[in-house]
Amino acid sequence: TKFYHALTKQRRVRNKIVGLHDDLGNWITEENGIEKVAVDYFDGLFSTTNPTDFDNFLDEIVPSISPQMNHILLRTATEEEVRQALFMMHPEKAPGPDGMTALFFQHSWHIIKKDLVEMVNNFLVTCNLDPRLNITNICMIPKVERPTRMMELRPISLCNVGYKIISKVLCQRLKICLPRLISETQSAFVAGRLISDNILIAQEMFHGLRTNKSCQNKFMAIKTDMSKAYDRIEWSFIEALLNKMGFDPRWITLMVECISSVQYRVLLNGQPRGLIIPQRGLRQGDTLSPYLFIMCTEALIVNIKKRRG
């Protein structure tokens, strides 16, 4: 036991943020100053560019969601559906601002199940989240030893369990629609597809480029890095995309409410500091984010195919 306590203490000391460089390169060590550097960084990252015209970019998206699918997406949540969403969670993952892990909710299910089902269905009917549910802590994981800049820290969102339950219920429903929406060029997060398939395809393509002389003169491969891809997605684009795909307006409202009603606090050395009201972006740590992201990526893929053709 002493060994693990010492290891935890050592890691806490090693990961402690004693100072950060601000945008001008100044070294800030005062606690309130470090908070300002972090808050200013995320304020800038989550500030919208106010894009408006998506018609041309979404022109090739074909409505794929039938009225029957929309009915399934918006139906009343059952007790079993909520129970599955809760018990899918790791019981001891890092807690959100409420300070409670999923373990407490799982052990207390027989007592609180009625309240949890009512909470989920209240959201499905009103499309309004209790603001307290969507307060989120940003935990910053060092990418390097002794980080000195915000770019050297990886933000992970720690959500409240109540929000996670709602999010997982919505995700389990959305999963049913994904095979109709997502082309086979994307293999992540879609049931029946493996991301390893695309790795094998990429290896075969590069092998062909290296060994086939005719390919070397006519083809090329481009690797793109989507820097801060989740953080820069505009909410207005997601709304326009979902509408184009044929989702019911009420489902779109549910999605937008989940991603836009969030308020962030930054965990600095274990303490929540500052307040960030984002204008765009998807949370890394929210169950919905990967599914919304691959749907946005699908719009990019459709446009690449359009230009190629």
Label every PLM stretch briefly:
Residues 1-151, 157, 165:
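Surface-exposed loop/turn segments and immediately adjacent short secondary-structure elements
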Residues 13, 134-135, 139-149, 175-181, ...:
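Active-site-adjacent bridging/hinge elements
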Residues 19-21, 93-100, 148-158, 199-243:
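Conserved catalytic palm subdomain of right-hand nucleotidyl-transferase polymerases, strongest
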Residues 40, 44, 106-110, 114, ...:
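Short, residue-level hotspots on alpha-helical faces of the histone-fold
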Residues 91, 97, 143-144, 161, ...:
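Residues immediately flanking
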Residues 151-182, 200, 206, 279-309:
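Conserved pre-motif C helix in the palm subdomain of viral-like polymerases
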Residues 226-309:
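Conserved polymerase palm-domain catalytic core
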